[in-house]
Amino acid sequence: MEISHVIVLALVQGISEFLPISSSAHLILVPKLLGWPDQGLAFDVAVHVGTLSAILFYFKDTIFKLLRDFFASIAQRKMVGDSLLVWCVGFATIPVGIFGLLFNNVIEEYARSGVVIAVTTIIFGIALYFADLRSTNKSEYEMTIKFALIIGLAQAVALIPGVSRSGITMTAALFLGFSHKGSANFSFLLSIPVIILAGGLESIKLIKDPNALPWSDIALGVIISAVSAYICVKLFMGIISRIRMLPFVIYRLILGAFLLYLFL
């Protein structure tokens, strides 16, 4: 890959990963629109690792407290502090893990098309609009296993490019009455095991074919995506309660309409 391609795609990943607009869709579309060769799924996952490091750093204090409560709950065999939230993240991850193992190859072969991305961008943009109207003031700490499983099932749909993992998990949480910040916080925490699972799956493939991954490109991509993702998350969390989801809904509808025009 050319250095300019790495920089642009890593920035796209970092900016779009935690916004409800589908980072995977943008990583597929940018090369297509600019006439660049597909960077491949391995690069996609590598820059996801960069965004993972950003979210781990942003939530480092929260994660430390949650893990402390979680291990205390195991030792005491009862819920301690906010340990339930860790269990909720775990249960919400199960559906995407199962569906990913079962349908990953099918999705890679048939769903990475401009038309699919256009349709899912529009449909789930509309869903985000109606979910935005249902939000209340529930925080992520009021999450239950039942709600987590519902959000987890929704997250599994995000295996299809254009749906947006962060978008559909926030949509589901908003529909369930969580606040904008609560929905975003749970979505971001939920991204941690999902990105680890995706990275692990691709790492197995890369071990079998180490030449498939240009390591110098990946190192640069990870750094750029990490820095841009951290800045984006910090800004997003600072304004989401004020701007709500309408700007992202409008963006998705415009993008989806443009893609339909482009690919039909």
From Swiss-Prot:
Record protein name field: Undecaprenyl-diphosphatase
GO cellular component, as recorded: plasma membrane
Protein localization: Cell inner membrane
Function (record text): Catalyzes the dephosphorylation of undecaprenyl diphosphate (UPP). Confers resistance to bacitracin.
InterPro entries: UppP (IPR003824)
EC number: 3.6.1.27
UniProt entry tagged with the keyword Transmembrane: yes
Domain of life: Bacteria
Membrane-topology descriptor: Multi-pass membrane protein
Reaction(s) this enzyme catalyzes, per UniProt: di-trans,octa-cis-undecaprenyl diphosphate + H2O = di-trans,octa-cis-undecaprenyl phosphate + phosphate + H(+)
Molecular function in Gene Ontology: undecaprenyl-diphosphatase activity
Pfam hit, one: BacA
Gene it is expressed from: uppP
Leader sequence residues: none
HAMAP family, per the entry: Undec_diphosphatase
Other comments on record: Bacitracin is thought to be involved in the inhibition of peptidoglycan synthesis by sequestering undecaprenyl diphosphate, thereby reducing the pool of lipid carrier available.
Stated family: Belongs to the UppP family.
Membrane-crossing residue ranges in chain numbering: 1-21, 39-59, 83-103, 113-133, 143-163, 184-204, 220-240, 243-263
Keywords: Antibiotic resistance, Cell inner membrane, Cell membrane, Cell shape, Cell wall biogenesis/degradation, Hydrolase, Membrane, Peptidoglycan synthesis, Transmembrane, Transmembrane helix
GO biological process: cell wall organization; peptidoglycan biosynthetic process; regulation of cell shape; response to antibiotic
